[in-house]
Design a protein with these regions (language model features):
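Conserved alpha/beta-domain cores
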Residues: 1-198, 204-206, 218
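Gly/Pro- and small hydrophobic-enriched strand-loop and loop-to-helix capping segments
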Residues: 208-223
């Protein structure tokens, strides 16, 4: 078995106050999650609703599950009973469906709006202009069973650290704009989710509050 405990502490021990670790457990077996759980990790990220559902039913109930992948509206109902946060909301349609399914379970689901800043067509998310438009039009204000907690983005998949830093800085600056204009009175709009195994140290420099780390903790994925 991969030495999950040692790797987890290597990552966590280097994190400054105010930065949370989301341990990305997709495609990893339950025993790896349990090993991290036994070392105190409580927040895990998954990107497939069926895998998440199966894990949530068998693993400890105090785990905080984050959905980090592209989520189709018709799949929200499968994770609505127990998801803590949906990190990649990229359409108003999805936001409304999360609200609808959360209401059925009499709960409020936290979400992050996903930005598409990376120079790759394969990434999902709002452009900065489209995100402004969504917030300006205000339909989201009527949704009482979702709470927008911040922004999320994935930087370009590149070795160019300056490009990564540029994209994350842009996201951080846009967060400040959105916070001041739309969420100034909401202390819970505070999350900036960027940074993965390969670039989380840059992300921390760029004011990330949540890093998504899988490979550095659990090793290569087990498909």
């Amino acid at each position: 078995m991969y030495d999950v405990a040692t790797n987890l502490h290597k990552v966590k021990d280097g994190l400054p106050d105010g930065v949370r670790l989301i341990a990305i457990s997709k495609f990893h077996p339950n025993e790896y999650i349990e090993a991290a759980y036994n070392e105190g990790q409580r927040v895990f990220g998954e990107s497939h609703e069926q895998e998440l559902s199966a894990k949530a039913k068998t693993l400890p109930t105090d785990i905080e599950w984050h959905f980090i992948g592209h989520l189709q509206s018709n799949k929200v109902k499968y994770i609505a009973p127990y998801i803590s946060m949906i990190e990649a909301v990229d359409t108003l349609k999805l936001l409304k469906e999360i609200n609808k399914q959360a209401a059925k379970h009499n709960r409020i689901i936290n979400v992050l709006l996903e930005l598409h800043i990376a120079e790759e067509d394969s990434k999902y998310g709002f452009s900065i202009d489209d995100c402004r438009k969504l917030l300006e039009e205000g339909d989201w204000c009527e949704l009482k069973n979702v709470h927008i907690s911040g922004l999320m983005m994935m930087a370009s998949n590149t070795d160019d650290t300056e490009q990564i830093r540029k994209e994350m800085t842009l996201a951080a600056n846009f967060f400040d704009e959105v916070k001041a204009k739309y969420f100034a009175d909401d202390p819970e709009f505070k999350e900036r989710s960027w940074g993965m195994s390969s670039d989380y140290e840059i992300a921390i420099d760029c004011r990330s509050t949540m890093i998504r780390v899988g490979t550095a903790i659990f090793g290569p994925r087990v498909y």
